[in-house]
Regions:
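Ligand-binding pocket scaffold of soluble enzyme catalytic domains
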Residues: 671-674
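Intrinsically disordered, low-complexity regulatory segments in eukaryotic proteins
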Residues: 680, 697-698
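Extended, well-ordered protein cores
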Residues: 2-268, 277-500, 504, 508-666, ...
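Short, solvent-exposed positions on alpha-helices
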Residues: 626, 677-681
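A glycine-biased, small/acidic residue-tolerant capping/turn segment at secondary-structure junctions
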Residues: 698-714
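Short, charged, amphipathic alpha-helical segments
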Residues: 680-688
């Protein structure tokens, strides 16, 4: 790999399809500056294939690209553009495996209930792939996310639709506030490097090692907390009754993708709580049939056909309890898909902002919007959303044409906090104590547990905390905007961080800067007050709030989080550039297959590519890469001003048309820039050709719409078929080829 190499990740679903169209343009333009753009396959299918080489024929095997990029991210040369990928739930994982098996890959099935060592090994490999398995590996730095000026200005000039709020809205957040992860949390700072052992000690003294070795560094913050399941069930029963009494929709909002151990278990308890009679009567039958509430109501209902004699009876019981209970929030009212069907369908960081943007409503079973009780069982961050809801109830909806912005500096590096806890999270088998023990036998932290409780330990290393504080000061200095650390002195982990933040802030010149430390609830209120005045406020947060807020505020400001600039300055000098904060849009793929129209908006890719070129220019001295960055910035501004994003309706341009217009504006900017005469000459002919052939090219791109498209697979499309579908304009393809 040369020092002028950019890695452009091949991922999943809509962004992967967009890559077939946009990557040839990127590679052609980059080649004029001596920049090599390579791909690495970190798609769900690719990660599955790479994990089972011994099961596959030689020609089917592929390298572990994620592991390779994880190592690259630790080097100064790293320049990685990361597109959104699938964080697979178990149903998605099984679907991907089935598709690959159908394509001739002799992969083992996912063992739901492994019986042998071989099955346990297979299960362990698959479990490493599921959930948010990609981002923690690549994120060897903290996060700097913000709306670029061009995007913010466009949103102000063309405000997206916001649902009206009334003071009578009955929408609220429900959260436990006791016996949950936040309220039970204990925290310690490690004095010297070593290892910890996580063990369970039963009432009779029997000790079971849950995790033999957890490496820790000096200065690291380690936490232990427990979610008590008896309290969870009592809480859920009360909220189901409350939703019924208040005549609002019942909904639960979790993060079963990233929190892939704890949240599917919590989701399963919600399903059980909503259908108490059915599980009391048929629970053992469902277990025997391998149907778990953790996988969602949809998986259970689909599996009832395989339950002899009483499958229909069980289905009727579920339907009766749906009729008796509060109305369920729906994912798809037309298809009868409820909030409880699939654990990964309602993801809190996307679902809560969407609800707030839509008058505090979700969709009900009758196909109409309605006020909603949003259940966020753990209280760590639930209060943030309640403050926003209360603010809208008093002041009405936000106005995108005037509101301020909340850029984020997020503590993320080296699997910080909850998002690195998967391998230290356990569903407890028996009552007792779980403790973290150091190499000398001293108990560092311990928690009393009952059977079924969920124990979780988290780690946050000191070097990332120092880097996070530095990044916060840097951004505050660069923008002149107040920076607020969202830390709660009443929470054990946050109290440790507050002490460190105060220590490390003292090392910087903060004269003239406004830097506050407020609890998440206080920080939300402070930021909202400024937003309504049109003022910006930097949120400096931990890993989870980084994730939540970089959806919440962009969705309110811009209508989407996919238009955010997401830069990860890697701690060893490289750069990771994430294309927006949105997901991978499965419904976009369904529409493409149905009618050959892809409404994916690649603005996030355009923004990330520009800062990637800029980083390359800075680190390697490649002046032409800087010209590419500057001209791409200006081209993106023209792209927005001319409104060339996908039209979202048949007969208008889609993702492919947006790539043409970006290529046109970029070529025009390159042709007229004066920093590099040779580059200007190289793009003169292309700019002329694309301009003259605009009508022909757009016609060719639109002509294919309206008929089904065959891409040869969902999780692993056929490359030739997908390329043919995504590059249907021979005129455009030939023009781009002239640069090679």
């Amino acid at each position: 790999m040369t020092d002028s190499t950019i890695i452009y990740t091949h991922t999943d679903e809509a962004p992967a399809l967009a890559t077939y169209s946009f990557l040839p343009v990127i590679q052609a333009y980059a080649s004029t500056a001596g920049v090599n753009v390579e791909t690495r396959d970190i798609s769900l299918a690719g990660r599955i294939i790479a994990s089972f080489p011994e099961h596959l024929e030689e020609g089917q095997r592929i390298a572990d690209a994620l592991a390779e990029l994880g190592e690259l991210a630790k080097t100064p040369e790293a320049n990685i553009i990361k597109l959104p990928n699938v964080s697979a739930s178990i149903p998605q994982l099984k679907a991907a495996v089935a598709e690959l098996q159908g394509q001739g890959y002799a992969l083992p099935d996912y063992p739901d209930d492994p019986k042998s060592d071989e099955e346990r090994e297979i299960r362990a490999r698959y479990d490493k792939i599921k959930g948010s398995a990609v981002n923690p590996v690549l994120r060897e730095g903290n996060s700097d996310r913000r709306a670029p000026a061009s995007v913010k200005n466009y949103a102000k000039a063309h405000p997206h639709r916001m649902g009206a709020w009334t003071s009578e809205s009955k929408t609220n957040v429900a959260t436990m506030g006791a016996d949950d992860f936040r309220s039970t949390e204990k925290s310690a700072v490690i004095a010297e490097a070593g290892t910890l052992r996580i063990e369970h000690v039963a009432a009779d003294g029997a000790t079971t090692v849950l995790r033999a070795s957890v490496p820790v560094l000096a200065g690291e913050v380690v936490d232990a907390s427990v979610l008590h399941v008896d309290a969870l069930r009592t809480f859920l029963d009360a909220q189901i009754a409350r939703a019924k009494a208040e005549d609002v929709l019942f909904s639960v909002h979790l993060k079963a993708t990233m929190m892939k151990v704890s949240d599917p278990i919590v989701f399963g308890h919600v399903v059980r709580a909503f259908f108490p009679k059915t599980f009391a009567k048929y629970g053992e039958v469902l277990v025997a049939a391998g149907l778990s509430p953790n996988d969602g109501l949809g998986t259970i209902l689909n599996g009832l056909d395989g339950v002899p004699h009483i499958g229909a009876e069980i289905k009727a019981s579920f339907e009766a309890e749906i009729a008796e209970g509060p109305a369920l929030a729906m994912v798809d009212s037309d298809k009868g898909i409820t909030n409880l069907h699939v654990p990964s369908d309602v993801i809190v960081d996307a679902s809560m902002p969407a609800m707030i943007r839509t008058s505090g409503h979700m969709w009900g079973p009758d196909g109409n919007e309605a006020d909603t009780l949003a259940v966020l069982p753990d209280s760590s961050y639930a209060g943030v959303y309640q403050v926003v809801i209360d603010d809208c109830r008093v002041h009405g909806a936000f106005d995108p044409s005037t509101m301020g912005s909340v850029p984020n500096v997020g503590l993320m590096a080296q699997k910080a906090e909850e998002y690195g806890s998967h391998d230290k999270t356990f569903e407890i088998a028996a009552a007792g104590t779980v403790r973290l023990v150091d190499a000398t036998g001293n108990t560092v932290l311990e928690q009393e547990v009952a059977a079924g409780d969920i124990f979780r330990a988290c780690q946050t290393k000191d070097a990332p905390i120092q880097d996070w504080v530095k990044l916060a000061v840097t951004r505050a200095r660069a923008t002149g905007v107040p920076a607020v650390f969202w830390l709660d002195e009443g929470r054990a982990h946050d109290a440790q961080l507050i002490a460190k933040v105060k220590t490390y802030l003292a090392e910087y010149d903060t004269d003239g800067l406004t830097i506050e430390i407020l609890s998440p609830v206080e920080a939300t209120a402070y930021s909202l007050e400024r937003i309504r005045r049109g003022e910006d406020t930097i949120s400096v947060t931990g890993n989870v709030l980084r994730d939540y807020l970089t959806d919440l505020f962009p969705i309110l400001e811009l209508g989407t989080s996919a238009k955010m600039l997401s830069v990860v300055p890697l701690m060893n000098g490289g750069g990771l550039f994430e294309t927006g904060a949105g997901g991978s849009a499965p419904k976009h793929v369904q529409q493409l297959v149905k009618e050959n129209y892809l409404r994916w908006d690649s603005l996030g890719e355009f923004l990330a590519l520009a800062v990637s070129f800029e980083h390359l220019a800075t680190t390697t001295g490649n002046a032409r890469a800087q010209v590419l960055a500057d001209t791409l910035d200006r081209a993106t501004g023209s792209f927005l001003n001319e409104d060339k994003s996908p039209s979202r309706k048949l007969g208008g341009i889609d993702n492919r048309g947006s790539h043409f217009y970006l290529a046109l504006y970029w070529a025009q900017e390159l042709a007229k820039q004066t920093d590099d005469a040779a580059l200007a000459t190289a793009f003169e002919a292309l700019a002329k050709t694309l301009g003259e052939q605009e009508e022909t090219i757009v016609g060719e791109l639109i002509a294919v719409q309206g008929s089904p498209a065959d891409i040869g697979g969902y999780y692993q499309p056929d490359a030739a078929k997908a390329s043919a579908v995504m590059r249907p304009s021979a005129t455009f393809n030939q023009a781009i080829a002239t640069l090679a």
